[in-house]
Design a protein with these regions (language model features):
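In a subset of proteins, long, contiguous C-terminal domains/tails are tracked
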Residues: 181-217
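Acidic, glycine-rich two-metal-ion catalytic cores of nucleic acid-processing enzymes
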Residues: 1-72, 125-162, 171-181, 185, ...
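Conserved catalytic core of nucleic-acid polymerases
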Residues: 68-175, 202-206, 210-212, 216-217
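Internal amphipathic alpha-helical segments of the cytochrome P450 catalytic fold
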Residues: 45, 90-91, 188-189
Length: 217
């Protein structure tokens, strides 16, 4: 695991989170069963941040909500939100309600960290302790908390998934941050709907990709 408690996603010397999507190397990974199905969580960190700060989006499509707030296209909105959640709020967007709430939460988190000497994560109860972390700042601390929440929630989700697919031909073969890759047998396609319902239980929106290799062709 990394300092933030997030998995490193390295196995056998390969960083699966950083596999190139353009040069065709993903085609080398093929399923033992009939196909790969990847379930991706949409807007994972904005969803978690909204939960932490008590903000409700006006639509299920969070990136579309941000595009409307910023008055930019969908792709640009995703980029802007990612940069601000990890690097701090841009001056021109600091008056948006979502980022006002985020900033208030970050400030309070930082005050607690300095007063108590630690913060405790809500699901895992893991503590980020001040005397064990170098060069910490408010935004970095918030990022650590987000990544721990993501990892803790994913562990819970995977426990449910494993219970559902145990003794099946289909397997969960890879987990990378916000995506779960399944090696799916043709006669077990019904499992995907069951697995989607697990994410729904946690109010997470997902999208699916499938193919006969990891490039989804």
């Amino acid at each position: 695991n990394t300092t933030t408690t997030r998995p490193s996603n390295r196995f056998g010397g390969i960083n699966f989170a950083a596999l190139n999507k353009e040069n065709g190397c993903r085609k080398a990974f093929i399923p033992e069963n009939n196909k790969f199905v990847e379930i991706d969580i949409s807007a994972y960190h904005p969803t978690l941040a909204a939960h932490l700060v008590g903000y409700k989006f006006d639509t299920d499509d969070i990136h579309a909500s941000f595009a409307k707030m910023y008055n930019v296209d969908y792709k640009k909105a995703k980029e802007l939100t990612f940069k601000q959640l990890y690097g701090g709020v841009f001056k021109q967007y600091k008056d948006l309600e979502f980022f006002q709430k985020v900033q208030k939460y970050v400030d309070e988190l930082w005050e607690k960290f300095n007063t108590d000497g630690y913060i405790e994560c809500m699901i895992s109860k893991y503590r980020f302790e001040k005397d064990k972390l170098d060069n910490m700042n408010p935004q970095k601390l918030f990022n650590y908390l987000l990544q721990n929440l993501e990892t803790s929630l994913n562990v819970r989700i995977m426990k449910h998934i494993i219970k559902r697919i145990i003794n099946k031909k289909s397997k969960l073969v890879l987990y990378v941050y916000d995506s779960f890759l399944f090696d799916l047998a043709d006669d077990e396609e019904y499992l995907i709907e069951d697995i989607k319902n697990i994410f729904k239980r946690y109010k997470l929106k997902v999208k699916l990709k499938h193919g006969t290799n990891y490039d989804f062709e």
